């Protein structure tokens, strides 16, 4: 990833600048670009891309590969036929910050030649030729255009992170590349020796409308150029997956970093981190501090404790500013970590693993690493998806320490013993080997890939999880065949995103209908306000209404945004969005069809037995059905604390399950 200049993120770079300031700034940026390690190999990289349809570039963080390579490709004519250079990122903050930096380097407003697109935010135009985006967004584009026909080059950045989206995207791009190469005359030539995945994609492309085929005809002699970029030095897995694709290494720019370990194990990592932060602040030289923590709750706790301890220090020692960064933090607040510190002040960045490779924050000279990270795990036998705290891998620890050596010599304080480091695993297990594959299955089906089990993943999922998913998917298909499509999508969209309801909205049918009541009440309040006030005033009144009713306004806004997005997508597909009004029976039958793999029956002692796994659970105390104890329920989520609980619960009729999936559920007396 690039090293971001400290003041890259003002809304208008040229505003309030004199001509001299602008020239000086431009010269400084040009000098920064020339000094990047990748600049020395520009011509070689361009030639490698010309000569190889698939290229793997391994470059340390700070080499300049993310900002410079797309500009090189644009400069050397890779957009000449009207194509776009697309660059995917695992995280939205990286897509935004890099796009802003590249636009500034090009001396143009963001959204013209250079832009970015993330969920709910598209800062691109018809002029955009360099487009940064999240990998999930490119997958959504593939739903409407399976050829990805507008792209001449796609760069998958941070591929070493091996997220679910990245692995699915790599498999999809491998198929797209093959299929586009065969569309010499604008018509796909089906090769029956291809894998089923290829057939599925070809059939889907053949069925697209003429507009997409015409778009492809423009590029009929131009196969898709695919570039995989990784900060990991081991590129073998990517090279082998793409048939022995060539790998090129780009040197980074790394200053020496001194590593410090603890003498004994730390029992309280939060307290150890706080002590280390203040030791650095009070005893070390200039430079900002980057602290790795496991999540939002931990970050907010440490930030609060820092402020409490600062108040106990003399005025002259309080010049310490805290900046959090985690994935759910609003984008505008994430951007604040890149702002320069006021003179005489030191910044402390409190970050999740988002700061390991996705973003490079300038000015960091000190890193505090407790050696922990939150990771998603899945138990296929129990059907439990959990987010747990685990130790980092050696590769992650090295990435973290490297953050201190981007601008000059640095120091990394590992809050564990050196012997503990030696026992860490070499690398992190890919997400696809430790997560629920249900969503992946549905995503691949939506992309037109029927043989999901044999999809060409870069690494096959865990066999136990795969077999459970295969069985579940078979039942899902059978249930779908038996059950007609429900006609009240409007309410289902509301249900899928609502959060945080009050008892006054409670429905005796369960939590899902309670959430629907909350959403409907909020929407009715907003629509009435909009009739007599401006939209801005109506939004303000809605926030107050949320506060008065103890509803999380940010979650409600997120639900409204997603609802609007899904409605737009559904309408583009030609489907009608209707409501079931007050017919809750239909809605509960729809819930049963959606969550039939997550059903539970009441036991004589009042507990519940999950029908497929046999796990004994309780209804969570936050549920409106906690005291009601219906005979049969479906649920969204299973969580483990001192007990196993199910959350987001609705009452259903057991016979609905028998109708939906007779192979799983037998008729009971």
Put a short name on every predicted segment.
Residues 496, 502, 513, 527, ...:
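Amphipathic alpha-helical interaction segments
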Residues 525-554:
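N-terminal leader/propeptide and maturation segments of large enzyme subunits in energy/redox metabolism
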Residues 469, 518-519, 535, 552, ...:
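Short, intrinsically disordered, low-complexity terminal segments
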Residues 469-529:
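Leucine-rich, amphipathic alpha-helical/linker segments
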Residues 315-322, 334, 479-498, 641-648:
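Charge-dense polyanion-binding interfaces
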Residues 635-636:
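Phosphate-centric recognition/catalysis
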Residues 1-474, 540, 544, 548, ...:
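P-loop NTPase motor module signature
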